[in-house]
Curated annotation (Swiss-Prot):
GO terms for molecular function: serine-type endopeptidase activity. The keyword Secreted applies. It is an enzyme of class 3 (hydrolase). The active site is at residues 75, 113, 193. Keywords: Hydrolase, Protease, Secreted, Serine protease, Signal. Belongs to the peptidase S1B family. The keyword Transport does not apply. This is Serine protease SplB. GO terms for cellular component: extracellular region. Residues 1-36 form the signal peptide. Its EC number is 3.4.21.-. Serine protease that cleaves specifically after the sequence Trp-Glu-Leu-Gln.
Length: 240
């Protein structure tokens, strides 16, 4: 573990699903010594990459990994069922990439908070490029890896109702990578669950799932780092 992350006393983390969905918390023994960054940008045009790779749930975020296939957290997908809807890269009430029905949910069998969701290819409500899901979105590619000190960005829909589904991008440094865990100093909020964690080349490093509840300069965020095993699971469950 990175020397800037010190195991000390109990600090509460929050699973970052909007209060409009679930209000779950978990406990972790972590205290940070580095100051968190608060570099957050509102995205004005969601019809360009990498923003075309992001989707919105009612209370959380997801992102595209292949044909008709998106990724989010287990704690998000457990509140959805076949027939429920997602919206591709909405930009408040200005535009979106179409609205699509969920057709299958597949949870990662390990402890990691990862869930694959397949959607119907034909939109309920069309996007700017027609009714086909794959014409309106852009799948992300994987990064070769990540290490402490690398710059990352988290793109998602914090407080989606309050912010009227405006997409936000938050940036900061990686604090540590250990096994399937990645810790980073980027500002995230409720609703960011399921957001992609990207490197400076907009390549996938992991998926965001939680951050410290405390709102101060030592606040860190937490994601699932994409190990070869997790990448294999995702690849095996992408729509053919």
């Amino acid at each position: 573990m990175n020397k800037n992350v010190v195991i000390k006393s109990l600090a509460t983390l929050t699973i970052l699903t909007s209060v409009a969905g679930i209000g779950t918390t978990l406990v972790e023994e972590v205290q940070q010594t580095a100051k968190a960054e608060n570099n957050v940008t509102k995205i004005k045009d969601t019809n360009i990459f990498p923003y075309t790779g992001v989707v919105a749930f009612n209370s959380a975020t997801g992102f595209v990994v292949g044909k008709n296939t998106i990724l989010t957290n287990k704690h998000v997908s457990k509140n959805y069922k076949v027939g429920d809807r997602i919206t591709a890269h909405p930009n408040s009430d200005k535009s979106n990439g179409g609205i699509y029905s969920i057709k299958k949910i597949i949870n990662y069998p390990g402890k990691e908070d990862v869930s694959v969701i397949k959607v119907e290819e034909h939109a309920i409500e069309r996007g700017p490029k027609g009714f086909n899901f794959n014409d309106n979105v852009t799948p992300f590619k994987y990064a070769a890896g990540a290490k402490a000190g690398d710059r990352i960005k988290v793109i998602g829909y914090p407080h989606p109702y309050k912010n009227k589904y405006v997409l936000h991008e938050s940036t900061g440094p990686v604090m540590s990578v250990e096994g399937s865990s990645i810790v980073y100093s980027a500002h995230t909020e409720s609703g960011n669950s399921g957001s992609p964690v990207l490197n400076s080349n907009n390549e996938l490093v992991g998926i965001h799932f939680a951050s410290d509840v405390k709102n101060d300069d030592n606040r860190n965020a937490y994601g699932v780092y994409f190990t070869p095993e997790i990448k294999r699971f995702i690849a095996e469950n992408i729509d053919k």
